[in-house]
């Protein structure tokens, strides 16, 4: 049986690990390093360079060197080299191929199976892109695992038998996650690791700290009348110097940034010699650090625990070596010291190797239960986001809900899938759309369309829709799409909290419109079906209220809709009274129940389990 490796595919650095005798070992690359820079370059001779060698030549080959490609995963980003366009998946695949080759050299055998990690807050498109990159690299991706979960797996296996809570604070080169996990062992030493909650920011990491230093140095030069903001070579040298300064300031209180012959101007060569203190560095990046606070607090709140209940805090990612990060985590945790016995650069890959061992049967003493980071649902009438799976639900998971049509004889429904926390789909992330056709002609509200969401262990979404009447089914695996822009996912949760009242009012107005439309339709039908039994004056009065409601529904005044709706609700009872009186006795009539609230007369026979929401035919919307 071939060996499986664990890969931490990072924004700035990547690591590969393997189980040897059941224990994880980090594999050194061909250059002797335990971490490989996530940098790919195309030399002018056509050679593809990856890792340290690509990073070293970046200054002299800027336009043909790609770094931090992880930030583009799941988007339509591409880079043109020698008239050929490369996607983010293809560039990432080059990094994975390098790690694969290094592992094969170390093990002396072919490597095809791998567990690859992603940030916990990666959306569906980003996870799919990561899996595709693995496939391009010739890897069979056994599982996509969240980075904080992998870290907890590596850290938590040697813990005691008591259930313990581990908080993982993962600040990498380009992404940030916080996760709370529960780790426990039974009497047989079988470990269960379950994610309780997770939060994060897909566009926050060490690269942003570096950029602040670059901006500061550029401004210092501007004061002297020198603008290098368009000088690509100078910018690359500044980026490298900024990264080095950041690292040095983790162990010393000041550093000197000295770059001779940084550029050449008409006045001569430009030299940079700037002193940067840790205090100044922390001042330049304070707002970046502040952005880590809310996800931390959200995780604690969603898990419903007290800070004192956290047993261990694990720092992951090279960026957590910054003293300000360590102190902030300690402060947020109520004074509890984060664990210093974990290598933040390697722990994720070690956890990935352990999970690979579990999947290959090398380790049989671990069960890993992860969660989906964002709620999933479909658009129903009025643009409402109807959730089928809530955020922080354990995966894999499956959930079905039955919906109905919005129009008479509607031949098809468009199933529009969204991810996010807001009440309306326009405020959430669209994942994809597919159409269920061939619905048998029937009055609206009669067809039953069962929509099923299935999230696999990789966190990848599969959606299907089935017409219960005809048995016709349509399904899709969510792929492609555009990834979330900076802070998008975090914004979804934040916006949901900030706009809760506004969303509630809009939701109520939409619900009123939907109910009002159903009432007008039902009362109209009741009048038509009983035209010969109703006195003219009753018909005229109620019909006028129906027409008034229909007119209000054509407008945008929600208050007018509510008023007209309430008026029709009151007057429609006269229809039942008139029909009852016409029948002359209870034996000859359907009774008051036969003319109950018209809003219920048409739909009451429907299955009680059917959700009171309608899927709109896209053609009607156009």
From Swiss-Prot:
Residues 609-622 have a biased composition (Acidic residues). Coiled coil: none annotated. It comes from the Bacteria. Keywords: ATP-binding, Chaperone, Nucleotide-binding, Phosphoprotein, Stress response. Gene3D superfamilies: 1.20.1270.10, 3.30.420.40, Actin, Chain A, domain 4, Substrate Binding Domain Of DNAk, Chain A, domain 1. Residues 496-511 have a biased composition (Basic and acidic residues). Pfam families: HSP70 (PF00012). Residues 588-603 have a biased composition (Low complexity). The keyword Chaperone applies. The modification Phosphothreonine is found at residue 175. InterPro entries: ATPase_NBD, Chaperone_DnaK, Heat_shock_70_CS, HSP70_C_sf, HSP70_peptide-bd_sf, Hsp_70_fam. Residues 496-515, 579-622 are annotated as: Disordered. Induction: By stress conditions e.g. heat shock. GO terms for molecular function: ATP binding; ATP-dependent protein folding chaperone; unfolded protein binding. Belongs to the heat shock protein 70 family. Acts as a chaperone. HAMAP family: DnaK. NCBIfam families: PRK00290.1, prok_dnaK. This is Chaperone protein DnaK. It comes from Arthrobacter sp. (strain FB24).
């Amino acid at each position: 049986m071939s060996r499986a490796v664990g890969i931490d595919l990072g924004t700035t650095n990547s690591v590969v690990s393997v189980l040897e005798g059941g224990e994880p070992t980090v594999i050194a690359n061909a250059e002797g390093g335990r971490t490989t820079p996530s940098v790919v370059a195309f030399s002018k001779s056509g050679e593809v360079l990856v890792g340290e060698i690509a990073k070293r030549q970046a200054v002299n080959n800027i336009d043909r060197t790609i770094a931090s490609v992880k930030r583009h995963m799941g988007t339509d980003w591409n880079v043109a080299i020698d008239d050929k366009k490369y996607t983010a998946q293809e560039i990432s695949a080059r990094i994975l191929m390098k790690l694969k080759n290094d592992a094969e050299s170390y093990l002396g055998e072919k490597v095809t199976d791998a567990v690859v990690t992603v940030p916990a807050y990666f959306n569906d498109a980003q996870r799919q892109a990561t899996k595709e990159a693995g496939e391009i690299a010739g890897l069979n991706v056994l599982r996509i695992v969240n980075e904080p979960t992998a870290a907890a797996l590596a850290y938590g296996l040697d813990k005691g038998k008591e259930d313990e809570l581990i908080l993982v604070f993962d600040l990498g080169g380009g992404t940030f996650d916080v996760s709370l996990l529960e780790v426990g062992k039974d009497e047989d030493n079988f470990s269960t690791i379950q994610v309780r909650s997770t939060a994060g920011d897909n566009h926050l990491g060490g690269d942003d700290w570096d950029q602040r230093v670059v901006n500061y140095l550029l401004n210092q030069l501007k004061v002297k009348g020198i603008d290098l903001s368009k000088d690509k070579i100078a910018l690359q040298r500044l980026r490298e110097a900024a990264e080095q300064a950041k690292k040095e300031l983790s162990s010393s209180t000041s550093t000197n940034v000295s770059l001779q012959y940084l550029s050449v101007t008409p006045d001569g060569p430009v030299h940079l010699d700037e002193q940067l203190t840790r205090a100044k560095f922390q001042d330049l990046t304070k707002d970046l650090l502040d952005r880590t606070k809310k996800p931390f607090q959200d995780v604690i709140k969603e898990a419903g625990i007290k800070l004192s209940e956290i047993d261990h805090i694990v720092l992951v990612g090279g960026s957590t070596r910054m003293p300000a990060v360590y102190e902030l985590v300690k402060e947020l945790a109520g004074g509890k010291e984060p664990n210093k016995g974990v290598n933040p650069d390697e722990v994720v890959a070690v956890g990935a190797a352990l999970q690979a061992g579990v999947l290959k049967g090398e380790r049989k003493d671990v069960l890993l239960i992860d969660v989906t980071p964002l709620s999933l649902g479909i658009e129903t009438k009025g643009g409402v986001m109807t959730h089928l799976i809530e955020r922080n639900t354990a995966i894999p998971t499956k959930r079905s809900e039955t919906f109905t049509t919005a129009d008479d004889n509607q031949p098809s429904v468009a199933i529009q899938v969204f991810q996010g926390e807001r009440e309306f789909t326009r405020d959430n992330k669209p994942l994809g759309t597919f159409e269920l056709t061939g619905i048998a002609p029937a009055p609206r509200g009669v067809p039953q369309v069962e929509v099923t969401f299935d999230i696999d262990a990789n966190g990848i979404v599969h959606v299907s829709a089935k017409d219960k009447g005809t048995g016709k089914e349509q399904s899709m695996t969510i792929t492609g799409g555009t990834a979330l822009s900076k802070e998008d996912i975090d914004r979804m949760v934040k916006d949901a909290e900030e706009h809760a009242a506004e969303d509630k009012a809009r939701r109520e107005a939409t619900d009123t419109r939907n109910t009002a439309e159903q009432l007008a339709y039902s009362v109209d039908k009741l009048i038509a079906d009983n035209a010969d039994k109703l006195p003219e004056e009753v018909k005229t009065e109620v019909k006028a209220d129906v027409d008034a409601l229909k007119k209000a529904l054509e407008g945008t005044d929600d208050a007018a809709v509510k008023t007209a709706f309430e008026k029709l609700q009151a007057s429609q009872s006269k229809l039942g009274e008139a029909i009852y009186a016409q029948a002359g006795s209870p034996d000859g009539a359907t009774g008051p129940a036969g003319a109950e609230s018209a809003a219920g007369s048409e739909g009451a026979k429907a299955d009680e389990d059917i959700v009171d929401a309608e899927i709109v035919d896209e053609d009607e919307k156009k």
